[in-house]
Amino acid sequence: MLKYALIPLLPFAGFLIAGLFGKYLKEKAAYFPIAGVVGAFILSVSAFFDVVNGVKLNENFYSWISIGTFSVNVGFQIDQLTAVMLLVVTTLSSLIHIYSVGYMHGDKGYPRFFAYLALFTFFMLVLVMANNFLLMFVGWEGVGLCSYLLIGFWYEKKSASDAGIKAFVVNRVGDFGFVLAVLLIFLTFGTLDFSEVFASAPTSVGMRHERKGYRPELAV
């Protein structure tokens, strides 16, 4: 279980080191985000082969929100789709990190750039690995925040600053639809966990159809 939890945590550790100690490490600050993302890639490859061999994971770490019978946990799920997306995210992120070493060389914001990049990877992995809709929304919001920070990285330039603000505003439109969808799912199924929603979905849809006089088995 620890192996899977380290997939998002390694890039987050790289973000913390580059973000907190970047001004002391200078360009060496890039080593830590790169190591974290490459480490996440190696663990993602291992997770992929675990899934190929029949291993599936749906584990909760702790209860995030608990009100009466309703609870939302911080947990990760790894299935076939997740395993593939982990490979995609960590492969692309590793290549971008390595390429950026030369691309950003000499820039005064070098450590800050790699901190943002590692944080972006962390939130993307949270989005991919989340086992409930609320945690996935947190990952989505984090990706949106990091997109704003990266697009407006050279904030001294008006064009970059304006582009960052524009991206932030556009993402908020998507957030509104996301929040409505999550609320509708909760009102319909009484839970936000993927496994419980997907297990209840066929029954719920069938009941709605029958109430409207539609019989799926007769629609041939």
Locations of the language-model features?
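...captures the hydrophobic TM-helix bundle architecture rather than a specific catalytic motif
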Residues: 1-220
